Each structure stands twice: as structure tokens, then as C-alpha cells.
UniProtKB/Swiss-Prot annotation:
GO terms for cellular component: cytoplasm. The modification N5-methylglutamine is found at Q235. Belongs to the prokaryotic/mitochondrial release factor family. This is Peptide chain release factor 1. Its main location: cytoplasm. Methylated by PrmC. Methylation increases the termination efficiency of RF1. One of its GO terms (molecular function) is translation release factor activity, codon specific. It comes from the Bacteria.
Length: 360
């Protein structure tokens, strides 16, 4: 391992011990905000510290085995121990490299997930409903909370557009690579000839930002329209102008919210989604500039990117970004997404490692 990396790991190990001591200090315990921040830092450093201490022990074991090679009686055993230690050292070095990769500060945050029907009319709206159900099931399996922020239902079911906030541990980090185009190939229920139709939906995943980090939005840049809610809601529907449409004039971003009966609550939800969308647009612009010198295999998460095809007649789902095909479509649509999410995360890590190697 390079001396520069070892030096960095030693500094992190020292910081881990320092934070551990601070957490036991009475002054820290009295300041709950500082205690929480240090607890998070301690948890983040723990894996690196454990792995580095293990790696250091393996280096000592290798040195001991090398010294034993000069003893004829111990040579065979020493060679076996040296081979075993080398293999362990390589595995630990690989793990440490992954642990040292730059972390996306948004990964641990809640996320807004937006599913929008694209080409394909009613069938696209039905598929948008299926995708939203798939993400909701996945969220349930991870004990995340799903709250619909805004929904525009399709005429024959599903959604023209649905935005939900998903809250829990590491939501954005797991779902961020879902952003992009999703295509479905299947025979619609209304199709009497049994012909396969192709429809498309787009998904956008945006981190929920704390208020302090939301982009500054000038109220003069907003056009706020109120209108009467449509859809489910019984006697309260169409009696008050509780629904809100906010247009951010500089970017043209439009957010509607009509899920709550209170105009005030709808406005608060719409502003939260608007802030996340503006932030996501700024991040995408920055990433595009950074990636212009380097081809990113995973795409930009732009609506025009084609992420996956869900082929119902063949029971197949294909992720085009990493050429992965699974014949487990029923399971995937029931929310068993880890078999698709894990390989994408691994590909992203490999891409980061390659970028680091190029920098060095």
C-alpha cells in the first residue's frame, strides 16, 4: 500500500481514538448536539479503524513469517503462513480503498422520489403506478416511511405523476441510481390482439435537504397559483382552493401539491419539493461539467437516460447501464430491488476507484 495512503489511514485511526475519548467526556455529554455529531463521526470512522488495525496486524504477521523462513525446520510452515497473510493483506487493502472513497454527503438523507408517465398514454400511467408500488414495497422491506407529497392520477388508474418523500436510514444512497428512464414492454389489458406495447416512465430521486442547506429562493422569483383539488377526498374536494402550483420563474421548474386539505400544508410541501428540485438541477449541472473529461458509465440520471427495460412476456428486467439481465421480474415488481441496486453501487465504486487511480 502506498505510504501516502498509510499516512492518511494513520491520521483517521488517531481521530477515531480522539473521538472515542471525547464521547466519554462529561462536557460532551452535556452538549447533546455535539454528542450526536461526534457519535455520527465515530460510527463513520469505526469501519476504517477496524480494517486498518487488522491490516497492520497482518503486516506484523508477514514480517514474523519472513524471519521464520531462514529456519529450515520452520520454512514450510512459514511459507504457508506468508501466503495466507499476503492474501488477507490484499483483501484488506481492497476493503480500505473502498472505505476511503469520497462519501456523498447526501447518501444518508431522506429522498423525494418522483415517477412520471412518459410516452404510452394510459399504459404509461399504469406502469408509473406499478413503479411507485415497487418502490413503496422496497421501502417497506427496509422499514422506511413513504409519504405522498403530490399525485396526479391517470384516467384509467396509475399516475400521470406522483411524488413521495421516503424517510429512513440511507434512503438517497440506495435509490439515487434509479433516476432516469424506465421502459416497459407488455400486452395492455385493453389489447385484444395480444400485441406487445412499449411505454416509458421517468424517475427522479432527489435528497431532502435540511432547511439551512436549501437553495436561497427569492419570493419574487415565484409564481404561486391556487386551484381546487381534484381526485380522492370525498366532500372536501372542489369546495376550497387548497391546491397549490408553484412556478420558479428563473428555471421554469413547476411543482403542484394538492394532497392536503390545507392550502398552508400544500404550500409547505410544494416548497420543500421545489428546493430539492432546484438543488438537484444545480448538482446535475456541476456533475455534467466534472464528467465532461471522463465518461461515466452510469449516466447522469437525466430523464433521457435509459436505465432499465421491464419485459413482462419474457419475465425479464435489463439494466442497460451495466448490461445486467435478470429473469425475476415478478420479484422485482414486488419490491425485491437489491439484486439490481447492489451491482449499480459496486459499478459506481469501481468508477470512483478508476477516477482516483487516474488522479494519482
Amino acid at each position: 500500500m502506498k505510504p501516502s495512503i498509510v499516512a492518511k489511514l494513520e491520521a483517521l485511526q488517531e481521530r477515531h481514538e480522539e473521538v472515542q475519548a471525547l464521547l466519554g467526556d462529561a462536557g460532551t455529554l452535556a452538549d447533546q448536539e455535539r454528542f450526536r455529531a461526534l457519535s455520527r463521526e465515530y460510527a463513520q470512522l469505526s469501519d476504517v479503524s477496524r480494517c486498518f488495525l487488522e491490516w497492520r496486524q497482518v503486516q506484523e504477521d508477514m514480517e514474523t513469517a519472513r524471519l521464520m523462513l531462514s529456519d529450515p525446520e520452520m520454512r514450510d510452515m512459514a511459507q504457508d503462513e506468508l501466503l495466507e497473510a499476503k492474501a488477507k493483506s490484499e483483501a484488506l487493502e481492497q476493503e480500505l480503498q473502498l472505505l476511503l472513497l469520497p462519501k456523498d454527503p447526501d447518501d444518508e438523507r431522506n429522498a423525494f422520489v418522483e415517477v412520471r408517465a412518459g410516452t404510452g398514454g394510459d399504459e404509461a400511467a399504469l406502469f408509473a403506478g406499478d413503479l411507485f408500488r415497487m418502490y413503496s414495497r422496497y421501502a417497506e422491506s427496509r422499514r422506511w416511511r413513504v409519504e405522498i407529497m403530490s399525485a396526479s392520477e391517470g384516467e384509467h388508474g396509475g399516475y400521470k405523476e406522483v411524488i413521495a418523500k421516503i424517510s429512513g436510514e440511507g434512503v438517497y444512497g440506495r435509490l439515487k441510481f434509479e433516476s432516469g428512464g424506465h421502459r416497459v414492454q407488455r400486452v395492455p389489458a385493453t389489447e385484444s390482439q395480444g400485441r406487445i406495447h412499449t411505454s416509458a416512465c421517468t424517475v427522479a430521486v432527489m435528497p431532502e435537504l435540511p432547511e439551512a442547506e436549501l437553495p436561497d429562493i427569492n419570493p419574487a422569483d415565484l409564481r404561486i397559483d391556487t386551484f381546487r383539488s381534484s381526485g380522492a377526498g370525498g366532500q372536501h374536494v372542489n369546495t376550497t382552493d387548497s391546491a397549490i402550483r408553484i412556478t420558479h420563474l428563473p428555471t421554469g421548474i413547476v411543482v403542484e401539491c394538492q394532497d392536503e386539505r390545507s392550502q398552508h400544508k400544500n404550500k409547505a410541501k410544494a416548497l420543500a419539493v421545489l428546493g430539492a428540485r432546484i438543488h438537484a438541477a444545480e448538482v446535475a449541472k456541476r456533475q455534467q461539467a466534472e464528467a465532461s473529461t471522463r465518461r461515466n458509465l452510469l449516466g447522469s440520471g437525466d430523464r433521457s437516460d435509459r436505465n432499465r427495460t421491464y419485459n413482462f412476456p419474457q419475465g425479464r428486467v435489463t439494466d442497460h447501464r451495466i448490461n445486467l439481465t435478470l429473469y425475476r421480474l415478478d420479484e422485482v415488481m414486488e419490491g425485491k430491488l437489491d439484486a439490481l441496486i447492489e451491482p449499480i453501487i459496486q459499478e459506481h465504486q469501481a468508477d470512483q476507484l478508476a477516477a482516483l487511480a487516474e488522479q494519482e
